[in-house]
């Protein structure tokens, strides 16, 4: 055990006669690169624990289990190719390491507790199709945005995907989308706050877990959805259907008086049935003042409706439009000038 503990070595050649690497063999050493030969059939726990200079490791192709704490706190280890026969990743295996990208092998069945905990640079990962178990806190404190749980998963531990950072004393969840394929209900205290949760059509969510998600899609459909853009764009990781969508945008650029100015571009992934204007409130009740593009018949039938400018970008140039259709680019200008009376 601990054969090269704390040694100042950059590389090391393991002879072909070696069949076992004992517990903690290289931990706290300064090793940078190492190839483990195919003759090695047993690797014990904490082999490279706290090897802060380690950047490259080649593992034997016949390896089926990654030992516990093998690369714990290897801060310079950014990626590693795992053997295709690997079925289990041990507890704390990559905890607090520098891993930022990894392809999990298709045969992987078990990810033990705390396996990737604290890998703050890890933003995405694809779970393989035969995975059965994800241990508690396995991906906690990572930067994962979107995750899909395979239907084969039968066990998932608490806080497994509490993907947040706690810098400066505040907690920010990185998780945006969760796709849940198992037939059993989405459990409580597994995921950090997320915007979208996709479950099977007949799927269920633990009652105290529902509040963790802004929108829940059953069979890809949700009853109502609100989109508010503080910036210039929004994104959704997976195709969705909503029975009703409310889209809010604040137009504060000053226009001309009775003439357009301060144009904005807009592209929406859905047709727009109704436009309304509210000066302060953004409640989803569609009770604001009705709006319509110049040329829309609503301006002729509703005396309370207010006009705005709308042009579609076509292959031959901008053309005046009376409605917004899905996935088409438009220029839009809302009358916004102090010379207008307040609405």
Predicted feature locations:
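Intrinsically disordered, low-complexity segments enriched in small/polar residues
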Residues: 1, 22, 88, 96, ...
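Consensus positions within tandem repeat domains that build extended binding/scaffold surfaces
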Residues: 1-5, 22-25, 44-49, 67-72, ...
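Predominantly extracellular/luminal carbohydrate-interaction, adhesion, and secreted-enzyme modules
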Residues: 159-162, 191
């Amino acid at each position: 055990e601990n054969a090269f503990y704390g040694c100042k070595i950059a590389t090391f050649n393991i002879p072909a006669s070696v069949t076992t690497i004992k517990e903690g063999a290289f931990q706290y050493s300064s090793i940078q690169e190492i190839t483990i030969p195919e003759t090695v059939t047993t690797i014990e726990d904490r082999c490279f624990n706290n090897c802060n200079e380690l950047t490259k490791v080649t593992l034997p192709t016949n390896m089926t289990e990654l030992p516990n704490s093998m690369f714990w706190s290897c801060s310079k280890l950014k990626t590693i190719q795992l053997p295709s026969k690997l079925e289990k990743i041990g507890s704390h295996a990559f905890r607090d390491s520098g891993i930022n990208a990894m392809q999990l092998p298709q045969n992987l069945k078990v990810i033990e507790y705390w396996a990737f905990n604290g890998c703050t640079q890890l933003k995405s990962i694809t779970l393989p199709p035969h995975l059965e178990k994800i241990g508690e806190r396995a991906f906690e404190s990572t930067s994962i945005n979107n995750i899909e749980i395979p239907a084969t998963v039968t066990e998932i531990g608490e806080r497994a995907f509490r993907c947040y950072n706690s810098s400066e004393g505040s907690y920010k969840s990185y998780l945006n989308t969760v796709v849940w394929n198992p037939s059993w209900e989405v459990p409580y205290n597994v995921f950090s706050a997320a915007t979208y949760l996709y479950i099977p059509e007949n799927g269920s969510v633990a009652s105290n877990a529902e509040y963790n998600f802004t929108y829940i899609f059953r069979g890809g459909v949700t009853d109502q959805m609100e989109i508010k853009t503080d910036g210039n764009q929004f994104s959704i990781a997976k195709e969705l259907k909503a029975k009703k969508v409310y889209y809010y945008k604040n137009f504060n650029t000053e226009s001309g008086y009775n003439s357009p100015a301060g144009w904005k571009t807009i592209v929406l992934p859905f047709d727009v049935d109704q436009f309304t204007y509210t000066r302060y409130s953004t409640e989803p009740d569609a009770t604001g003042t009705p709006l319509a593009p110049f040329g829309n018949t609503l301006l002729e039938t509703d005396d309370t409706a207010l006009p705005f400018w709308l042009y579609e970008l076509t292959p031959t140039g901008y053309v005046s439009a009376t409605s917004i259709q899905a996935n088409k680019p438009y220029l839009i200008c809302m009358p916004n000038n102090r010379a207008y009376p307040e609405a």
